[in-house]
Amino acid sequence: MAKYLIMLFPIFALMSFISRNATEPNPWTTKDMVSPEKLSSLIQDNDKSNDPIILNIGPSGAIKGSLKIGSVDNPKGLGLLTNRLSKIQKSKMVIVYCGCCPYDNCPNIRPAFTILNKQGFTNKKLLDLPVNLKVDWIDKGFPME
């Protein structure tokens, strides 16, 4: 009996995680989204005064100028993100992206955006990658490292 409970626990934990994510509202709004086209133009703009801080919070490739944090679906990753954010002015434009998968399945964007909200960032953005980084950024020829 104990053997079966041990085998079933991960399944129940996963189901709980999925149902919780499905019922919780996203911590971002449509006004918090930035299109790939807009970010690409900001990256290629010669005016460095309006450059955003771009944080890669997933396992995907590096967009030009982004800082690699890595996955934040674990305490170590959340700690790295929190530490990096502590060095950034709250009014600075901060754009996060993961690009591993569609938003509904992504384990990284919700925790990252929640931290941005809790820390009081006023110009926080989520890069709009509804499918993944390859389809929504790389295949369209936007700048990579």
Feature map (PLM): residue ranges:
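Rhodanese-like catalytic fold shared by cysteine-dependent sulfurtransferases
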Residues: 2-4, 16-31, 61-145
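Flexible, polar/low-complexity N-terminal or interdomain linker segments that lie immediately upstream
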Residues: 6-63
